[in-house]
Regions:
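Membrane-embedded alpha-helical bundles of multi-pass transporters/translocases
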Residues: 1-180
């Protein structure tokens, strides 16, 4: 999969369009669009099996899906800080950023642990070397962990963002904050 992950570099070119896109849509909507791309990527990658063209397409879509949340997530934190200021509370950008970083570390640790548990439960034996033949259950788990399981988490993010309403109020809040 090393060569396949190079295709995510192609998706990085979409970052050039982000400033223009943010003039027409909110940060939340751009992240939601990325979630949709990742969900589609997960389906494509799961169905691809050993089809290199589909794997390349899925990896490009995956990159296009992960970039918005990676790059635009901090902007949501700034919107929350603006909201705090609008409510008369301290902005707390540092605290919000630290919580975000801490949550990322905890999430990565839990995700890595669960990957190990699921791979072990599927019959994967990593210490057998190149001579081992992986059981079908381990191959299926690898496919699931690379495709549908992350896509399901992006679907959860997409659902949660439906309840994020600051994007509709942020321009008015920022104007009020500047007037104070």
């Amino acid at each position: 999969m090393g060569i396949m992950s190079l295709f995510t570099v192609v998706a990085m070119l979409t970052m050039i369009a982000y400033p223009a896109m943010l003039k027409k849509m909110s940060v939340k909507n751009l992240i939601q669009l990325g979630c949709v791309f990742y969900i589609v990527a997960g389906l494509v990658l799961f169905l691809a099996k050993d089809n290199m063209a589909l794997l390349a397409t899925g990896n490009i879509l995956m990159g296009m899906g992960t970039l918005p949340i990676s790059m635009m997530g901090p902007l949501l934190i700034i919107e929350c800080a603006d909201y705090n200021e609008w409510c008369g509370r301290p902005r707390m950008e540092g605290t919000l950023g630290s919580i975000n970083g801490f949550a990322n570390k905890i999430g990565s640790a839990i995700g890595t642990f669960l990957c190990g548990v699921l791979m072990a439960a599927s019959g994967y034996v990593g210490s057998a070397g190149d001579t081992a033949v992986l059981p079908d259950s381990a191959l299926m788990m690898i496919r699931l962990l690379y495709s549908l399981i992350p896509a399901a988490f992006f679907a959860v993010v997409l659902f949660c963002l439906k309840f994020y309403t600051l994007d509709k109020k942020i321009d008015g809040m920022r104007k009020e904050n500047e007037e104070r």
